[in-house]
Amino acid sequence: VYAGMVEAMDQAVGTVMDTLTELGLDDKTVVIFTSDNGGLSTSEGSPTSNLPLRAGKGWLYEGGIREPLIVRIPEGWQSTDGSVKRQPVSDAVVTSVDFFPTILSLVGIEGMPAQHVDGMNFVGPLLGHQDYQRGPVYWHYPHYGNQGGQPGAAVRDGAWKLIEWYDSGKTELFRLDVDPGEQFDVASQHAAKRDELLEKLHQWQQDIGALMPSVNGESKLNQLRW
């Protein structure tokens, strides 16, 4: 079933691209292909694998939050930041809130001064610029997932990534440039970096008014019989 769904998705994308060509719109259209989470690999039949990344959908490890991203832009496309070149691969960090300011730039529309924009324009990497700096990226996952994921939050800043697990209060720190599979927690060896990222994470949660989970002392869940 899973393989059939992947095949159907591939066919659907092909149908969209073929239709754009038939309508003469392929050289006037930007196509963005991505996903809302990593591949399903830890539950519900474990139909696939995200190796070398750890875990999958429903988890704060890279297997759960690192998704494919393909941006198809006609060569020579003029954005407000310059002419877009073909850029086969970029290792720039991008998150979904970055799409809005990026699309505005690609279609030549300036953002309204009163608009609040959480994301960052990533046309730079599409232009081949190597000096693009995204800054910290955050995730807030205050609930359990049916794939086995636990409540927590994460922040990535450059090569460093910190995860805070709400149930246990434990924090994990990883260097993704040398450990993309998140096998080696280096929080104890780099306590200053751990504390720095944890402070940034908590400040971000406060700034956005993140809803935090709390223990339900009256829960009867442990008495349920399935």
Range-by-range predicted roles:
Residues 184-192:
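Active-site-proximal N-terminal segment of extracellular/periplasmic enzymes that hydrolyze or transfer
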Residues 2, 6-9, 13, 30-35, ...:
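Beta-strand elements within well-structured catalytic alpha/beta cores of enzymes
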Residues 133-135, 201-217:
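Bilobed periplasmic-binding protein-like "clamshell/Venus-flytrap" ligand-binding domains
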